[in-house]
A protein has these predicted regions:
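Hydrophobic transmembrane alpha-helical segments in integral membrane proteins
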Residues: 1-23
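Membrane-embedded alpha-helical bundles of multi-pass integral membrane proteins
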Residues: 16-23, 27-29, 41-196, 201-204, ...
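Membrane-proximal N-terminal segments immediately preceding the first transmembrane helix
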Residues: 1, 36-43
């Protein structure tokens, strides 16, 4: 019988390592192979399409802020940020920044999703994984905003549990999932969906977000 403990252990304990391994391996493989589709996909962003310009600009900048917020918010040791802010101040800052960047990312990804499904040229050149990831991103950002709202209503201990779980994953702490075993289901869906995005990300055109700047830097250094 599949128990809640088994599901928590699998999705919050093992899945992160599977997803991060696939992501890292995929990034390395695509970098070495230097797949032309990475650079070709970036040409879609040079366009007179207003929805594309606004959508891509909002999404790219906002999602970078979201990612930065997650990295700093979840992985910065408590003893370090306690030098200049309390845990409660950190939570309020996370709510504020998460709301702003999340809302901007939601508008941006919505414009891109509409364009991907309505533009015949984009439709013809897109693969199934490209559609899957934009839908997953739309779901992820929506869940993230929902999580932000829940954070305003939940206890500080619940918020800190996320931090302890994330840091436990990175230091290979056994049973780190127990920190968030009783967390709201929306948090867990947000986490699982995020790792699903990690798994398929290297195989989609969104690789240009990382690879185009990296390949440009490599080529510039060689010259």
């Amino acid at each position: 019988m599949i128990t809640a403990e088994y599901l928590n252990n699998f999705f919050l304990g093992y899945l992160p390592y599977v997803a991060l391994t696939v992501l890292a391996t995929g990034l390395i493989y695509r970098t070495i192979r230097r797949n032309n589709t990475i650079q070709a996909s970036s040409s879609q962003f040079i366009s007179n399409d207003k929805s594309l310009r606004w959508g891509s600009t909002l999404f790219h900048y906002a999602i970078l802020l979201v990612l930065l917020g997650h990295i700093l918010g979840l992985l910065t040791p408590e003893w370090l940020y306690n030098w200049f802010m309390t845990n409660e101040t950190k939570r309020l800052l996370a709510i504020l920044m998460g709301s702003i960047s999340g809302a901007a990312a939601l508008v941006g990804i919505t414009l891109l999703v509409v364009r991907r499904f309505s533009n015949k040229r984009v439709w013809a050149t897109s693969k199934i994984q490209d559609y899957v990831i934009v839908v997953l991103l739309l779901v992820q950002i929506s869940l993230g905003l929902w999580c932000t709202y829940i954070t305003t209503q939940s206890s500080l201990e619940d918020y800190m549990g996320m931090e302890y779980w994330a840091q436990g994953i990175f230091i290979f702490e056994p049973d780190s999932w127990k920190y968030i075993a009783d967390a709201d289901l929306i948090y867990k869906l947000h986490i699982v969906n995020g790792f699903l995005i990690f798994i398929i990300f290297p195989f989609t055109k969104l690789m240009h977000m990382i690879m185009v700047p990296v390949l440009y830097a490599i080529d510039h250094f060689r010259k």
